[in-house]
């Protein structure tokens, strides 16, 4: 779904715009089935190893992960995009409904950045670790400086309704024109406290099917999931104009849309998966620091 002129202007003025109704259940269903199948496999492995006692096969997608997580935090190991490398995920990265909106901001030639994640945020009461609450940061802080010279567009996409109770994001608008704020490491890469904007945060609630579009300079953080068993499932994907740096050059980006040169578009899932396998092996041999601090 293409964005309206008003929505595009809101993004460029404030560094963020939330648009409901971009994606449909039909867009999500294949990927959710893949993630559910992963949970099936991973839970069975953990049970065979004695790590859990109950598979909770009667629980729905919204809550099952949390029930298993309550027995073992290992349920999520291997769940991220670069680990799964599933065809359904590859197809979603090239989803036309999403790319129509992305094109409204980036133009007709688009690459998918390798900075992309599946996130399963279980209820905070199940684990006291602050690692499940990402601190205030800009996406520019988790990429190399090369990406500062172009617009890197983050698409934050909930797979279930993201509410305050379920731990939706908080963000600070109107920082897009300030640019990169100095970050520091420790407790998760975060904006230096003395560099934090004075503007108050806004809760970024969004329904399944909606997308939050963020500039790489818009500060945001996650908040505690205060529900009993609901998991806040979400994706964060990033796109850049074709040929522009992603800020993580040692991992593979690829062309997802090109009006001028459609032959550039990568449609081969196996090739995409191979690019990731090769890049991860090279990263194992010659580690590169992903964040700029």
Model-derived segments and spans:
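Non-heme Fe(II)/2-oxoglutarate
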Residues: 41-44, 49, 211-213, 217-293
């Amino acid at each position: 779904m293409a964005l309206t002129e008003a929505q595009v202007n809101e993004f460029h003025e404030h560094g963020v715009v939330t648009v409901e109704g971009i994606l449909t259940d039909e867009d999500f269903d294949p990927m959710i089935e893949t993630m559910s199948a992963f949970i099936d496999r991973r839970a069975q492995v953990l049970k065979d190893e004695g790590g859990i006692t109950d598979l909770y096969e009667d629980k729905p997608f919204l809550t099952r992960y949390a029930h298993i997580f309550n027995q073992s935090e290992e349920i999520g190991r291997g769940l991220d995009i670069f680990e799964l490398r599933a065809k359904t995920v590859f197809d979603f990265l090239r989803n036309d409904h999403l790319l129509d909106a992305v094109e409204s901001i980036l133009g007709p030639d688009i690459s998918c950045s390798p900075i992309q994640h599946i996130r399963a945020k279980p209820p905070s009461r199940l684990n006291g670790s602050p690692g499940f609450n990402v601190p205030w940061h800009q996406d520019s802080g988790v990429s190399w400086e090369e990406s500062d010279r172009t617009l890197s567009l983050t698409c934050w996409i909930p797979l279930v309704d993201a509410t305050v109770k379920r731990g939706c994001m908080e963000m600070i608008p109107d920082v897009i024109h300030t640019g990169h704020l100095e970050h520091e490491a420790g407790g998760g890469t975060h904006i230096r406290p003395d560099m934090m904007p004075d503007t108050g945060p806004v809760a970024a609630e969004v329904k399944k099917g909606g997308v939050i579009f963020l500039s790489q300079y818009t500060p945001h953080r996650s908040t505690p999931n205060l529900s009993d068993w609901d998991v806040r499932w979400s994706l964060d994907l990033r796109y850049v104009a074709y040929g522009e740096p992603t800020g993580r050059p040692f991992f593979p980006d690829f062309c997802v849309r090109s009006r001028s040169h459609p032959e550039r578009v990568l449609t081969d899932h196996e090739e995409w998966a191979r690019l990731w396998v090769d890049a991860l092996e090279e990263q194992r041999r010659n580690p590169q620091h992903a964040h700029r601090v």
